[in-house]
Amino acid sequence: FGIGKLQDNYFQSSVINFEEDRSDRSLYRLIGGSISFYGSTLNSRQYATKGYNEKLIAQIFTGKERYKPGNPAEQPVTQERQSWLQISYMKEAYHSMAPKFVLGWMAEALYSSRNFSENFTATMMQAAEFSPTPHSKLMYNEAFRANQFLAAGIKPMFIFNDMFHLRGEFYGFMPIFPIEKNTQNKAFYGKAFSKVEYMGEVSVICQLP
């Protein structure tokens, strides 16, 4: 259980005059709670090569959004209170296929009944994200955000020794209902299962004892 306040500052256009333009702001005041179940035998919290990890999380939230445009000529908007449920499940596992070769896989599914925010940009910033790699967790990418999605991937690895391994990670991401925007920059749901996005990463990992 928790009480929180979130604030997103953003521009709704890719053409920005930083001397004159002011960012829009969406402020959320929320109350929520969650219950989760975890199980893990991974040999490392990051870049694991053995074991499995599984988690099921259910969350419920209620709150209000206040939108303040960057343009002072426009009036702020406060949305009615909304409540929503979010459920997610993820599992990853690693299997030794040969003395030097490991094959990992992962699958993730998420469902959220959250309504749209005041505009498309605010909606996407608050949508659930698929970020299976450390690098993807640092990046904002609208292509891998949705209120409901399915995702899966494989992780082939070549083990050099106890410290070094070559790791590939390749994922597919499918929003159940992709979030689109209209000409007024408002969000709406597109056709079900109409988009698939892909993500790949290859890296050499050094894990110190």
Q: Which stretches of residues belong to each language-model region?
A:
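Transmembrane beta-barrel wall of Gram-negative outer-membrane proteins
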Residues: 1-20
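Short, small-residue-rich loop/turn micro-motifs
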Residues: 3, 60, 172
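Short acidic/His/Gly/Ser-rich catalytic and metal-binding motifs that mark active-site loops
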Residues: 7-12, 63-68, 176-180
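C-terminal outer-membrane beta-barrel translocator/porin domains of Gram-negative envelope proteins
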Residues: 21-26, 30-161, 168
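Active/binding-pocket-proximal capping segment
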Residues: 124-129, 166-178, 185
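Hydrophobic alpha-helix feature that most strongly marks membrane-spanning transmembrane helices
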Residues: 155, 159-165, 169, 173, ...
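Short, surface-exposed loop/helix-turn segments at secondary-structure junctions
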Residues: 182-192
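Predominantly the C-terminal beta-signal and adjacent terminal strand-loop region
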Residues: 191-209
